[in-house]
Amino acid sequence: MQGATAYSHHDLITLVECFGKLDYKVSQNISVVVDFGSNIGISALYFLTRNINVQVHLFEPVPRNIKRLRDNLKGYENRYKLTECAIGTKEGKFDFSCEDSGRYGGLIEKDVENFHGSSSDRVITVKVLMANNVLREIC
């Protein structure tokens, strides 16, 4: 199995959750996974190593995370599809707050239910797709 690079202690927590504690435990016959907020690809790597035929659909808006995700998933490019965007209840372009580790963040839209308002370190503008539309397309 390919190893994953952890860039912070937050990434180590995710490694333990996925590969140690098996928080995302799935059967070996899993065939499709949808991962909203894929971060640096650690959970995707877990799913990709459960079944050689699984297809994983990844959604991540943070550029630094996307580069790290691609590095962590080298060799699996034909088994995952990465869409560089956030997922929400409304489509469009929205502000997204993210802190230095890249693990925590969320959409900022004060008047929209289910959007995360935050005063984090960094705010970027990201493309947002509606969760229901994405799931309908995949399933």
Labelled PLM ranges:
Residues 1-139:
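Phosphate/nucleotide-binding beta-alpha loop and adjacent structural elements of enzyme active sites
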